[in-house]
Amino acid sequence: MARNLTQEEIDAFKARLCAVAERRFAEGGVASVSMRQLAEELGCSPMTPYRYFKDKDDILATVRTAAFDRFAATLEAAGASVAEPRERARAVGEAYLAFAFAEPNAYRLMFDMTQPDDDRYPDLERAGSRARRTMSAHLETMAQRGLIHGDPQVLSYVIWASIHGLVMLRLAGKLPGDPDFRVIHTEMLRLLAAGMRAPMPAAMPAAMPEASLEAGHEADHEAVSEPVPPVMPKPIRQQRKRSSQ
């Protein structure tokens, strides 16, 4: 006669199930995660996962929630380690990279757009909001002190999009190594910092008048007949590593 599992055993099984789901997602996307496949890999009955999760979306949402909580905790700890706003921003940024490269499978799953809507899972929405607040809090302080110009919330998304794009390029193996990742990252941060310190430009119109759009289309059509040769960017020279001071 089968005995009832203890809560500790149940928690351990759920943790193993989530770990397998995270790995399978990283290897083959959502299609490679099914209740049957998970049960088969864990060596249990196909119905066992249903005792603890409604379906695979429920499992993936649980994995994402835990990942966002770990991500937020990592950023919070980094931000609390320094007091000066600019150094805090630097520390949070370094913690972001450290998490992404230490847990690439979790990072990909956190931001995969094919996952269930966060509002279907309150805990997932809470964890995601916690991470976003942590990324934007130091920018609000910097804006209040006049260190940067612009809406802190908008700027946080601009920075997030930039760092996320760079991280995903590296995880996908799209950065050749010359220039070095750190050279690209440093240059990106320099440009972002310079932009945030610059005075805000005049607001762009919400929508271009229809006549302007038509004129733009005509100009585009004329430009096609006389193609302009592309301007190739100058190669970035890799910085020499300085000896430790």
Please describe what each predicted stretch is.
Residues 13-22, 38, 63-71, 75, ...:
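Generic hydrophobic, amphipathic alpha-helix propensity
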Residues 1-12, 23, 200-214, 218-245:
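N-terminal intrinsically disordered/low-complexity leader segments
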Residues 16, 20, 24-58, 62:
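Helix-turn-helix
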Residues 65-90, 120-135, 139-141:
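Amphipathic alpha-helical linker/stalk segments
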Residues 62, 76-106, 155-159:
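Hydrophobic alpha-helical connector segments
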Residues 119-145, 153-158, 182-194:
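Amphipathic alpha-helical packing segments from all-alpha helical-bundle domains
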Residues 30, 148, 175-176:
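Conserved hydrophobic residue
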Residues 109, 141, 161-178, 192-202:
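Amphipathic C-terminal alpha-helical segment
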